[in-house]
């Protein structure tokens, strides 16, 4: 009788642990399925998709999303390309001097400037960014901590390398991925 009772207790213990492990696995799967918002820049050469860093640059991320959602970037050209360094866009004047009509406070952070890093372009004044952004073509560690890094290309880095001065951002959208 004692052996039967021990087997019963062991069986209940084992069953409880298996159920807990299964439920834990389901919770973990749901966490892994968590979606993120991305920016999709559509060009004739293909799409550039980048994820945001809202914890490192919350106001900058919000500003970019706001501009994209109201169609600000649609039809703008990439006005700058420095081989082996960056491509730059987001200027409605198309010459590097334009913006949305306001500036935002810098959110300098220590996110490294790697290939595909997306950051805000600005003048010499730290709080002069508005809508212009650049995407690194190669690592640029000398920029670290001096510019607001707010994203990283996750798809389309080949497209980034094909962008030339005058290429158009046909449409920029914010999507869930």
Protein language model regions, located:
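Cyclophilin-like peptidyl-prolyl cis-trans isomerases
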Residues: 2-177
């Amino acid at each position: 009788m004692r052996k039967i009772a021990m087997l019963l207790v062991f069986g209940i213990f084992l069953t409880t642990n298996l159920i807990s492990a299964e439920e834990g696995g389901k919770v973990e799967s749901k966490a892994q399925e968590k979606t993120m918002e991305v920016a999709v820049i559509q060009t004739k050469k293909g799409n550039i998709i980048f994820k945001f860093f809202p914890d490192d640059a919350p106001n900058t991320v919000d500003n970019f999303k706001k501009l994209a959602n109201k169609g600000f970037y649609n039809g703008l050209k990439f006005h700058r390309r420095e081989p082996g360094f960056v491509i730059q866009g987001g200027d409605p004047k198309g010459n590097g001097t334009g913006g949305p009509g306001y500036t935002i406070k810098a959110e300098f952070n220590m996110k490294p400037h790697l290939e595909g890093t997306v950051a805000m372009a600005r003048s010499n004044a730290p709080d002069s960014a508005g809508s212009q952004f650049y995407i690194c073509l190669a690592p640029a560690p000398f920029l670290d901590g001096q510019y607001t890094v707010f994203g990283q290309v996750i798809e389309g880095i080949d497209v980034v390398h094909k962008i030339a001065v005058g290429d158009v951002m046909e449409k920029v959208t914010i999507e869930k991925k």
